[in-house]
Every structure is written in structure tokens, then in C-alpha cells.
């Protein structure tokens, strides 16, 4: 089965072609980072308009790279949520229009299920069951995964997502958007031990997260430095390191608890923050000590992309899931509502 995948949930326009027998044939991505950087964050209206501008050229590019014509495509998968409604509607409308014109089905895919399954595009994919850490700008969740569509929520953030905390902390210190990579870059030059940040909700049982207090702690630390006349680059680096260490250790502690609770030794990390090198090193060490395994997608498939949507859609269509003819998107969409295969 050959599936065209379209991703437009936020500020990346992603298109890909995935074949159930040959694997990923082509993928293309346009990031709107430069468009939104001047505003310090994503502007939904601008995001939607840019998706309209980029979608068809990217589809043509992917078809050309794969040496494919529309008559060879068996189905279209598109992101139906969660995400920005206007942005989602661009992808959904395009998918349904092309599906009608080409006489093929179009299936709405859950954005976070796409992220969760992205490591399965790698040469050594994880086997079910496993525990997944979904960590991005909009989500921080621990999920027990027994199969596609068989998801049990173990824990989630009670306020800010980890990626959101990275971005907001970076913005407080005057760093560029998106803040996550900027924090990680500065942390490499930070001096360990100058600042000690708390590990939120690690001093009590449970698998939920909270990052708003950590963000406030970072703000107060930065303001104290500025008040003392130290708004230097080194101060930013030291705060970035302390902040990143706190987030990474918190995520690692919770993942270890989740694995023990589920009785598993396989961990999948997915979402934009899963590209963070310090997080990968920490989780690899933890799983190594447990004699377990950790899986993640290649860096370009950690952030939003069309490949994960094409793959997830292909799995569901092959299992017999029927497409909906309605153009329906959801800004909020709990993964537990997805049907099991």
C-alpha cells in the first residue's frame, strides 16, 4: 500500500510517501521558524496561510523525488489533530480534495500517534509492548503501548509541557525562537553546580509532571543575575545547563518509575524534545543499567513531519480502518479515544 502523508498541525508543512513494502520513498518539510521568530512564537493565522502556500509544491516535490504519479497512490493520511484548527483544516481539506479527485480514501491521523510510531521507521524498530514518553512543545505524557491504538495513559503534565518550558525559559533570557535548541546549545558551555534547580514532583509517588514552577524558578534566577549586574552570556549558559539538567533528570526519574510500574524494559521517546542529546544520553544510561532498550526516531523525524503521518495512516488502513468522508479536525484529542487495531 502506497500512502501520501500530510502534516500541518502547527508550524511545519510536511509531506511524505510511504510504501508498506518498500518503506519511506520520499519526504519533504518546510519549517516556518523564520516566519514566526520575529513574534517569539507561532501566530496561528500566519501558520495557516503559509501551509496553503507550501502544500501543493511540496506534494509535487515528493511525487517527483519518488518518481510517482497520483494513480499509483492508494490512500492519503493527514493530521486531524490535536493542533491549531486553522492549520489542521488546510491539510484536511487538501487531503479530502485530492482523495476525491483521485478516487482513493483519506484518513485522519492523530498527531501524537504519528510521533509515537515514528521510531518504527528506523532499521531496528521497537516491538510491542513498551512504555512511551511523548515529550514536545504541547505534550508531556507517559503512555503504556500494547499495540497500535492500545494506549493507557500513565502520567502527564499538569501544566506546561517540557518543550513549552524550554521555549518560555529561553524567551525570558532573550534567546531566539524556538528556545529548546537554544537552551541545549548554551547548556554545552554551562558550568555545572553554579545553580541548583528543583526536580518537580519527584519527591512524591506518581507519574505526573509539572514544569511551570521550574520555569518560574529559572525566571527568578535570571532576574537575580540581572539585578546583580550579571546578564552575561556565561550566566545564560549556566542557567541553561541547570534548567536542562532539571528537566532531563525529572523525565528520567519518571520514565524509570513508569517502566517498573508497567513491568517493562522497552522505552520509546518521541516528540520534538526527544531530539535533545542530554535527554537521550540520560535515558540510554538508565535503560543500560536496567538492561533494557530505548528507541527513538532520527533527529529529523523527532519534530513534526509527513513521514510519521504516512506510516501511521498506512498501519491503520492496512488493518481495515475505514476513512471518514467528513472534513473533521480536533484541537484537543486524547489518544485514549483512538480505536485499537
Curated annotation (Swiss-Prot):
Cofactor note: Binds 1 Fe(2+) ion per subunit.
Reaction(s) catalysed (UniProt annotation): L-threonylcarbamoyladenylate + adenosine(37) in tRNA = N(6)-L-threonylcarbamoyladenosine(37) in tRNA + AMP + H(+)
GO molecular function: iron ion binding; N(6)-L-threonylcarbamoyladenine synthase activity
EC number from the UniProt entry: 2.3.1.234
Gene3D superfamilies named in the record: 3.30.420.40
A GO BP entry: tRNA threonylcarbamoyladenosine modification
CDD domains in alphabetical order: ASKHA_NBD_TsaD_bac
The protein's name in its UniProt record: tRNA N6-adenosine threonylcarbamoyltransferase
Amino acid at each position: 500500500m502506497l500512502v501520501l502523508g500530510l502534516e500541518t498541525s502547527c508550524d511545519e508543512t510536511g509531506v511524505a510517501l510511504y510504501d508498506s513494502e518498500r518503506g519511506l520513498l520520499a519526504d519533504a518539510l518546510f519549517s516556518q521558524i523564520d516566519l514566526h521568530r520575529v513574534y517569539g512564537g507561532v501566530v496561528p493565522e500566519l501558520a495557516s496561510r503559509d501551509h496553503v502556500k507550501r502544500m501543493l509544491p511540496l506534494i509535487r516535490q515528493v511525487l517527483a523525488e519518488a518518481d510517482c504519479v497520483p494513480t499509483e497512490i492508494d490512500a492519503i493520511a493527514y493530521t486531524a489533530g490535536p493542533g491549531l484548527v486553522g492549520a489542521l483544516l488546510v491539510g484536511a481539506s487538501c487531503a479530502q480534495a485530492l482523495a476525491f479527485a483521485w478516487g482513493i480514501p483519506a484518513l485522519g491521523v492523530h498527531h501524537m500517534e504519528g510521533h509515537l510510531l515514528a521510531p518504527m521507521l528506523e532499521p531496528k524498530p521497537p516491538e510491542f509492548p513498551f512504555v512511551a514518553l511523548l515529550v514536545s512543545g504541547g505534550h508531556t505524557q507517559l503512555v503504556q503501548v500494547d499495540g497500535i491504538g492500545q494506549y493507557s495513559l500513565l502520567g502527564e503534565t499538569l501544566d506546561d509541557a517540557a518543550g513549552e518550558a524550554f521555549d518560555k525559559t529561553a524567551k525570558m533570557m532573550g534567546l531566539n525562537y524556538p528556545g529548546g535548541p537554544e537552551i541545549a546549545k548554551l547548556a554545552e558551555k554551562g558550568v555545572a553546580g553554579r545553580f541548583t534547580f528543583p526536580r518537580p514532583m519527584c519527591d512524591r509517588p506518581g507519574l505526573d509532571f509539572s514544569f511551570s514552577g521550574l520555569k518560574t524558578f529559572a525566571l527568578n534566577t535570571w532576574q537575580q543575575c540581572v539585578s546583580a549586574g550579571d546578564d552575561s552570556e556565561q550566566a545564560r549558559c549556566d542557567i541553561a545547563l541547570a534548567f536542562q539538567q532539571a528537566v532531563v533528570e525529572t523525565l528520567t526519574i519518571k520514565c524509570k518509575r513508569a517502566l517498573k510500574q508497567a513491568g517493562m524494559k522497552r522505552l520509546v521517546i518521541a516528540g520534538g524534545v526527544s531530539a535533545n542529546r542530554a535527554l537521550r544520553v540520560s535515558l540510554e544510561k538508565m535503560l543500560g543499567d536496567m538492561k533494557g532498550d530505548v528507541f527513538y526516531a532520527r533527529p529529523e523525524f523527532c519534530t513534526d513531519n509527513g513521514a510519521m503521518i504516512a506510516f501511521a495512516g498506512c498501519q491503520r488502513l492496512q488493518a481495515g480502518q475505514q476513512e471518514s468522508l467528513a472534513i473533521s479536525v480536533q484541537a484537543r484529542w486524547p489518544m485514549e479515544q483512538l480505536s485499537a487495531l
